[in-house]
């Protein structure tokens, strides 16, 4: 998903500004600590714009500079990611971007529509990801309103994904996985437990679903990145002020 968003971003800029943009693509390889090092390098170089792909990259960029325009993508909830109590759709300052938030109530509806006999739903996610926690809380509320029992099963990183997934499989009739980068990197381990146990998973995005789920209500991450690239074009051309640009979906 993240690679698709990056490619969409690059394609949008290359189409609008052919031969005029130089890209410096640095991958943190799933390590949040690497994000700070990478972003500090960008700031030292005086880049014209930073595209921050996923929450860890966005928070690192926001901490590193208040001057260079920052466009986030693959961010679920900007208010949660940036700890903004009064978020109203526009971050302000030097930050804007796009959100990958799908309709969580519709995802909850999928669980009850596909599995009407399900009584217990395990909510499987990474506790270190604020956006994952946000999605879990929203889906839990939706399911509670339908009379469905839920329980949270949180792993801290890739090291305990398998053990936590096993606990979730032992508990649940259905597992729900939100948009979560750690889960996305460990779909094989998750599938190796859920499939033999006969426990289906409804997922928050297509990449996770293709690895370990049965259904999802998702977005195109390529299109999301492309939209982010279109926003970048407006900023680089001086057509838009990032401080007034609302988050796009």
Predicted regions and their residues:
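Short, well-structured alpha-helical segments in soluble
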Residues: 32-49, 57-60, 162-173
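Hydrophobic alpha-helical segments within soluble ligand-binding/sensing domains
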Residues: 78-119, 219-240
């Amino acid at each position: 998903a993240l690679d698709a968003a990056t490619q969409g971003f690059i394609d949008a800029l290359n189409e609008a500004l052919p031969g005029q943009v130089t890209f410096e693509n640095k991958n943190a390889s799933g390590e949040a600590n690497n994000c700070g090092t990478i972003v500090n390098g960008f700031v030292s170089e005086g880049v014209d714009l930073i595209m921050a792909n996923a929450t860890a990259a966005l928070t690192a960029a926001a901490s590193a500079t208040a001057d260079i325009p920052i466009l986030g993508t693959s961010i679920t909830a900007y208010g949660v990611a940036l700890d903004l109590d009064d978020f109203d759709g526009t971050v302000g300052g030097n930050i804007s971007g796009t959100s990958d938030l799908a309709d969580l109530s519709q995802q909850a509806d999928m669980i009850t529509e596909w599995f009407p006999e399900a009584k217990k739903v395990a909510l499987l996610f990474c506790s270190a990801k604020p956006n994952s926690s946000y999605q879990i809380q929203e889906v839990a509320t939706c399911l509670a309103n339908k009379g469905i029992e839920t329980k949270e099963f949180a792993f801290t990183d890739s090291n305990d994904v398998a053990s936590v997934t096993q606990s979730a499989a032992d508990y649940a009739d259905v597992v729900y996985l939100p948009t979560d980068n750690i889960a996305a990197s460990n779909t094989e381990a998750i599938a190796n437990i859920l499939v033999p146990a006969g426990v289906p998973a409804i997922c928050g995005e297509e990449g996770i679903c293709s690895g370990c789920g049965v259904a999802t209500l998702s977005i195109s991450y390529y299109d999301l990145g492309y939209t982010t690239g279109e926003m970048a074009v407006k900023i680089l051309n001086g057509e838009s002020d990032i401080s007034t640009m609302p988050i796009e979906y």
